[in-house]
Swiss-Prot record:
Family: Belongs to the class-III pyridoxal-phosphate-dependent aminotransferase family. OAT subfamily.
Species name: Staphylococcus epidermidis (strain ATCC 12228 / FDA PCI 1200)
Matching NCBIfam families: Orn_aminotrans, PRK01278.1, PRK04073.1
Gene name per UniProt: rocD
Primary location recorded for the protein, binned into one broad class: cytoplasm
Protein name: Ornithine aminotransferase
Subcellular location(s) per record: Cytoplasm
GO cellular component terms, A-Z: cytoplasm
Top-rank lineage group of the source organism: Bacteria
UniProt catalytic activity: a 2-oxocarboxylate + L-ornithine = L-glutamate 5-semialdehyde + an L-alpha-amino acid
């Protein structure tokens, strides 16, 4: 029995079976490359669902981690830490917002944004108590905690978790008429992924986000953009909402904000929104801790200094155009923006992902029939060409 098989057996025996990973164990990683305990090398084309946009173990981010770990790692928000202020300033200026509220995971940040939206609805907009509604979209994925689960349109995500939370409406992604019909006097916010990741890399119709912006302005509604997966360069723009030249009222960021090294997420908005929080109304023991702040500062610097959005745009256009040249009866559509690309099939994508793994390329199916490609944004054209050869061989 190999070391990998032993590890997988231990995980299957002692771990809850809430994931069905590909049968591979990763023990080392650098850049776009990962290695298993037996020494086999693979190209990572998933980037931990876009958490590793800067590449595995980017030296600047790792150095920031080490330097901070030698000083202080956690003080809780009962006290100030010496780099949280710097982090606040950097992330607010990056997004063009007045204030930031740091959390740890994407789901936590979504919960935070929903709490802010509801309190804003009552304190600022004047909606009748306990009547606020939030509109989301079919196919959405905002996390695994109870509010995101209640928002979901996937029956399996909700099965056995009732009673679900109330106050949510769902409409078809990209359908303007349904969205307009769902708005009423109690609508507090519209929560949208600018590109739906888990649903299969669904890109909205051109101008759809602009329409959301206009409707929010017209009806005094908060436009909340969940950029956890599509943001920070993944789509070929710093923020995926930039494709429609709009700025949401609230950004939710995570994943790549920690450079694939340490979890950190954030809700960003102007004073009118985040000033609804008062001392004791929200918090997190680890949110904004010194280690996360140091890592995140370095992670942001890498995104900007190395122009990862620009790299994603240029290489993504090349990659997508080459994928579209592949002719195979199983391929229904190739879509995406930047290095955030899906190949939708007429059949299950899992066997193709398993075949690509045998070719030394790691990716994962999503929504059953879509192969998702989201490599680290530091990938080179030469490495992309290597990936293309492996993909073509699987579809030969």
């Amino acid at each position: 029995m190999t070391q990998s098989e032993k590890i997988i057996n231990l995980t299957n025996h002692y771990g809850a079976h809430n994931y069905v990973p590909l049968p591979i164990v990763i023990s080392e990683a650098e850049g776009v490359w990962v290695k298993d305990p037996e020494g086999n090398t693979y190209m990572d084309m998933l980037s931990a669902y876009s958490a590793v946009n800067q590449g595995h173990r980017h030296p600047r981010i790792i150095q920031a981690l080490k330097d901070q770990a030698d000083k202080v790692t956690l003080v809780s928000r009962a006290f100030h830490s010496d780099n949280l202020g710097q982090w606040h300033e950097k992330i607010c200026k990056l997004a063009g917002k007045d204030k930031a509220l740091p959390m740890n995971t994407g789901a936590e940040a979504v919960e935070t944004a929903l709490k802010a939206a509801r309190r804003w609805a009552y304190d600022v907009k004047g909606i009748e108590p306990n009547k606020a509604e939030i509109i989301a979209f079919n196919g959405n994925f905002h996390g695994r905690t109870m509010a995101p689960v209640s928002l979901s349109s996937e029956a399996e995500y909700q099965r056995g978790y009732g009673p679900l939370l109330e106050g949510f409406r769902k409409v078809e992604f990209g359908d303007v008429n349904q969205l307009k019909a769902a708005i009423n006097k109690n609508t507090a916010a519209i929560l949208v992924e600018p590109i739906q990741g888990e649903a299969g890399i669904n890109v909205p119709p051109e101008g759809y986000l602009k329409t959301i912006r206009e409707l929010c302005d017209e009806h005094q509604i908060l436009f909340i953009a969940d950029e956890i997966q599509a943001g920070l360069g993944r789509s070929g723009k710093l923020f995926a909402t930039d494709w429609d030249h709009v700025k949401p009222d609230v950004y939710i960021l995570g994943k790549a904000l920690g450079g694939g090294v340490f979890p950190i997420s954030v809700v960003l908005a102007d004073n009118e929104v985040l000033d609804v929080f008062t001392p004791g109304s929200h918090g997190s023991t680890f949110g904004g801790n010194p280690l996360a702040s140091a890592v995140s500062i370095a992670a942001i610097d890498v995104i900007i200094d190395e122009d990862l959005p620009g790299r994603s745009l240029e290489l993504g256009e090349y990659f997508k155009s080459e994928l579209k040249k592949i002719e195979h009866p199983s391929i229904k559509e190739v879509r995406g923006r930047g290095l955030f690309i899906g190949i939708e099939l007429h059949e299950s994508a899992r066997p193709y992902c398993e075949a690509l793994k045998e070719q030394g390329l790691l990716c994962k199916e999503t929504h059953d029939t879509v192969i998702r490609f989201a490599p680290p944004l530091v990938i080179t054209k030469e490495e992309l060409d290597m990936a293309l050869e492996k993909i073509k061989s699987v579809f030969a």
